[in-house]
Amino acid sequence: MCGIVGYVGGREACPVLLKGLHRLEYRGYDSAGVAMVGKDGALNVYKCKGKVSDLEHFLEGKELGGSIGIAHTRWATHGVPNDVNAHPHYSESENIALIHNGIIENYRVLKDALEENGYTFRSSTDSEVLVNLIEYIRTTGGCTLLEAVQQALRQVVGAYALAVIEKGNRDEIIAARQSSPMAIGIGEGEFFLSSDAASVIEYTQDFVYVNDGEIAVINRHKPLKIVTLDNHEGRVDIKKLQMSISQLEKGGYPHFMLKEIYEQPKTIVDCIRGRISPDTYEVKLSGVIDNRGKFLAARRIVFVACGTSWHAALIGEHLIENICRIPVEVEYASEFRYRNPIINADDIVIAVSQSGETADTLAAVELARKAGAFVFGICNVVGSSIARATDSGAYIHVGPEIGVASTKAFTGQVTVMAMLALAVGREKGTVTEEYYREVAKGLLELPAVLEDVLGLGDRIADLSKIFTYAHNFIYLGRGYNYPTALEGALKLKEISYIHAEGYPAAEMKHGAIALIDNEMPTVAIATPDNTYEKTASNIEEIRARGGKIIAVIARDDTHVRRSADYTIEVPVVTDCLMPIVVSVPLQLLAYYIAVNKGRNVDQPRNLAKSVTVE
């Protein structure tokens, strides 16, 4: 949600800012803007509702000189999407400009106080309150911009990542963070600021990740300085980010989502590389090896996640309970943190997040740590907030995921959970050697299996045309594939805007069957497992009521094939890995239906890639 970019150095700032904003478009936004200090010291703010391309058109003919600037893509929280509410925001005197991600919870109190001191406001945002508070402190207290930011943020309740520049100062950006991501790229005599380091990766691979409660003083003529709100010196810890520009491009595909679907054979290879021996099938996860005692002593494992990551966690529940015989609970992070959960020191809390910045999941991590639990993270983005806040963890290593609808991150998360279950199960002695080797071997073979499944692309594209104008879908699955049904339904609703719901197949008769008619398609996952015959019976019930059935079946299936109107035939792997195999054709089905409907597949309406506000 929202994106921040900043630059100070020897280059022209505007091209750097605009390129960075384009790289952040995947996060979801409704308006964009830039602020720059020109060579004459003038502070210029340009912003508009719409896409970054609309901003570029708006900037034609404007004064864009200067080597310092900040830029922003906004996802509306306070105030409707329009030009006035877009960022950056001027202070009332237009001497200071600010960009801000997050939510200021006590903005109303602060705004009332400023209005009593004569301030008026152009917008209805909480962010404009913050920039005017900084200006008020600066002018009444005769302090520096840094001191004004420090004093202002001591009064703020809420989350923020912000950057501030001021008229006449061509050398310095003040930036701060609390519960919202911020990274600073370090170059030769120049600095790059971003809410996602990947947006400026072409300029540097050296990054400092700002921690909660820290303020960065970014001056082109001085080393980077980190201080706290109380003016204690912070640590400048430079991390190397290994990423190539090609990972951020479409590579000839029409959409990032399609590219990321087709990358999955490779991303599974990257996910398991060095973690499973092709000779002995031994699974080694350093996060388990280094914390063996914690896993052996665990009374319970609790997953906390949101969205697609929550669906992956449901599969993780099956994996760990079946293989490790440890009780597992799966919680929505947004609910977990507010219901006073019972967490003990012998619990393990596993936080799952692609970005590692999901606000509710990060808050759940902090709650679990305060309760004394051991917290393990499963993330994609190296150096992310959750990766740094957890006691240990495992990266999924699937590379940048730009499409808002998650695809390769989901299969990567499930792959890591399978390896985690095997590693812990062997340590506990709860998995047979035969099954251990079967699953480990299956993981090594997954890339080839997914290449095979992706060969269904043309078949699924043709099938999608039949259902483009459906208004509702039901997805059914059982066991390991109930979460897969949930995920398939989520993919469809996210990018096509068709209402879709996932159910355990047996639960259909407890309500959802009332919806079945010839205008309600059902996607039924009926691959071989111990519930196959039951699922086949559920499909017959749908058929008897005139429902259209798309069945995901094994290639050698002869039973369900006769009941379904259409089939998607997939290769069979060991039971616990079937969700990875089945999810790929469901991703393709959602993709092609959305394309047929002319949807913006990579940036669906109202959605953001990384939900960094509560």
Task: Write out the residue ranges for each language-model feature.
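Glycine-rich oxoanion-binding loops at beta->alpha junctions
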Residues: 67, 71-84, 279-292, 316-352, ...
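Glycine-rich phosphate-binding loops that contact phosphosugars or nucleotide phosphates
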Residues: 296-445, 525-568, 589
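Generic C-terminus detector
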Residues: 257, 548, 561-563, 573-614
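Structural beta-sheet core signal
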Residues: 4, 98, 164, 175, ...
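Glycine-rich, anion-gripping cofactor-binding loops and their flanking helix/strand elements
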Residues: 183-208, 334-368, 507-543, 573-587, ...
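Active-site phosphate/pyrophosphate-binding segments
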Residues: 264-268, 272-302, 371, 392-521, ...
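Conserved short alpha-helical segments that host acidic/polar catalytic motifs at enzyme active sites
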Residues: 1-250, 254, 266-299, 338, ...
